[in-house]
Amino acid sequence: VSNTMKAPLIRELVLKLPEGQPFDYRAGGFMQLTAPPYRLDFHDIEIDEAFTDSWRIAGWQEMRGSSDSPVTRAYSIANRPQDAAEGRAVFNIRLAAPPPGREQEIPPGIVSSYLFALKPGDEVQASGPFGEFHVQPTDREMVFIGGGVGMAPLRAMIHEQIGKGTTRKMRYFYGARSLADLFYVEEFDAIAAEHPNFSWTPALSDPAPGDRWTGATGFIHDNVRAAMQKHPAPEDCEYYLCGPPVMISAVLATLARLGVEPHSIFNDDFGV
């Protein structure tokens, strides 16, 4: 249906589901998406004007992607309740670009390249949804902690809870590198404005000089520690984590120091 750029390396991919087929979806689930054999020249990918400078400086349009056989990867679903009702599945696709200076020896991600280049009308082989990463049916306060495309399942969970009219307190800590890497900002600002039981803290670890960022800075686990140290009972909250492995490890160590037991922590590392 659409494949919209949200950050220099992140697109929101919206797929229309086959009519008449059951879609047993719960927020936090994922699907398996398959890239067929393909050849791709990144010069052929249309880049939004807002991100052309980032692409030019990084030299990403010089990359080429290819696969000689089908390859499948898991991607978390970023749906809001209305998306599923309209027969759509939403994903946050992060293009796995090689480290700077190593483009000639390390190819970009096989499946992420294919999905990043999709255009409206293209068909995608998909299966699912799957997964056990869901909000627990309790009355405890929920703390969501994400980074990168770890946004996807957490966004779905928050929208699911809002749609149910929950009165549970919810906090969302989201880490990005710079302002260009931050997305769905207006959406979460609006939720926070309309729902007093929801608050969110976007934090930038390396804001660009031109960002004029006045919000939280530093790594997300440090922001979580600073906020939850002031909480009367951080061990009584539930924690939902999704993001890069290094972020997950740092957050788990932070939560352990706060006295949070492992049974109160739920995490997923699909699609990161």
PLM regions with names:
Residues 28, 150, 244:
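Short, conserved phosphate/pyrophosphate- and ester-handling motifs at nucleotide-, phospho-/glycolipid
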Residues 139-140, 163-170:
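Conserved S-adenosyl-L-methionine
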